Amino acid sequence: MYRRDFLKSVTAAWVAFGLPNPLGGAFATNRVIPLRRLGQSQRFDYEWLKERARALAATPYHSRKRVLPTPLERLSWDQYQSIRYRQDHALWADSDAHFQVKFFHLGLYFHSPVRMYEVVDGMAQELAYDPAAFDYGSSGLNGKGLPKDLGFAGFRLNTRKDIDRDFAAFLGASYFRAVGQEGQYGQSARGLAVNTGSSGPEEFPDFIAYYLEQPTADADTVVMYGLLDSPSIAGAYRFSITHADVLRMDIDSALYPRETIERLGIAPCTSMYQVGENDRRMGWDWRPEIHDTDGLFLWTGNGEWIWRPLCNPLHLRFNMFLDNNPRGFGLLQRDRDFDHYQDDGVFYEKRPCLWVEPKHGWGEGSVQLVEIPTFDETFDNIVAFWNPRNKPHPGQELLFGYRLYWGAFPPVSSSLAYCVATRTGLGGVVGQKRKYFSWRFAVDFVGGKLAALARVHDVSVEPVLHMTRGRPEIVSARPLHEIRGYRVMFDVVPLEDSAQQIDIRLYLRDTNGEPLTETWLYQWVPPILEERKY
């Protein structure tokens, strides 16, 4: 399936799920209606699920997408959004557990039923779909006439203390989201990415079953499992989700390829970047900036900290950052100033960062970044993931463990200064006639030792600047007292006959040659000769 066609449906459906449930309180009652179970309970643990995934990979793939009843197929987005799971049917609402589960209905874009199981004392039993568990709102449906075995589309988690607002949701293919202390959804994670950014169609694996382990009354963590399947690979996942200001997901995955996979994406992060300070190409909206995240943050295996601002390119852009045993990576929303977005409906300044922390050595490979052109803020056009160096082959077992952190800031930080803003525009000297085209970059760094250095006169802070082609001009690094940091400014003069991309690398160092800042990377594509205005 082609990514844009798929994401037109699934990512649009996520837009409103970060909002409180306006109907949730109306469903709250003291009476709890237990969910009906199907069949006999069976022994369950993660080893059993891994064997199930291994056996699945040894058989031909078959799609679980079903033809839905016409009324469900024809739902508008507003109609689908009005269908809500009833609080009196919530899983674990009749227990003392801190967590509860509510399910999503099939319909609109969601055609693949996901089987749901509850795990109690090591025994798993399937949960039955029940039309009476849903309030159909303004959808025009009342549940009558729907198949008894229709199934669920996904689920969301909330706490007993806040039944109207979920903190994590799993819906569509292998997508899931969570919130931190800001209580705002933003970017997504996925169980797996297959052939993202390649020349052919991308494959979107599905979680086909979830196993939800009933937590004890005093547990601050909920444990669940997912069975994943797709034409080229099957997998078993274990999630341990700790609800806190920075929400943590501890994930173990076991993957079993059916086919050789060209590009496997581990721990994929999916986000949106339409317009920002550094890239205003799509800036015709009245809002100054529109993005879920504004940069890729890397902590490499050799200890280097790297910041790569995101872009909304003219054409699909693919970058790989070679590494060995990475310490972490993620898509961050560093700009948290409401004035930079001016959107009091979706609150982009509150969107969570997502940080990936490998639990053990992942070996050689690369963090890969895919940036896709977009005209629409409901289309997720940014993907980052880990790609192992060796392509997976049938018969292998691939084990990856990692933690995901969702919150306003990543759980790790460097003692070095970091980039807080990247701005670009026409180069040259103000008041002087420009004789050729150049492009200006202004990069602001704060933190580390810079605040102290900015207060001292005659201190030498040197910018270290490299670029793959073209030449730099008017390079400077000076204190900027308004931010208690430094601003680096430079112009890039592209080759006259080339519109090839220019890779730029920058950091600040002191007189002893020691770095003062993280490494700032940028990829700039100059306009063709005929479009260079100066």
Swiss-Prot record:
GO biological process: beta-glucan biosynthetic process
GO CC, alphabetical: outer membrane-bounded periplasmic space
Keyword terms of this UniProt record: Periplasm, Signal
InterPro entries: Gal_mutarotase_sf_dom, GH-type_carb-bd, Glucan_biosyn_MdoD, Glucan_biosyn_MdoG/MdoD, Glucan_biosyn_MdoG_C, Ig-like_fold, Ig_E-set
UniProt GO MF annotations: carbohydrate binding; catalytic activity
Post-translational modification: Predicted to be exported by the Tat system. The position of the signal peptide cleavage has not been experimentally proven.
Endpoints of the signal sequence: 1-28
Pathway(s) of this molecule: Glycan metabolism; osmoregulated periplasmic glucan (OPG) biosynthesis
Cell compartments where the protein resides: Periplasm
Family in the record: Belongs to the OpgD/OpgG family.
Function: Probably involved in the control of the structural glucose backbone of osmoregulated periplasmic glucans (OPGs).
Protein's recorded name: Glucans biosynthesis protein D
Encoding gene (name): opgD
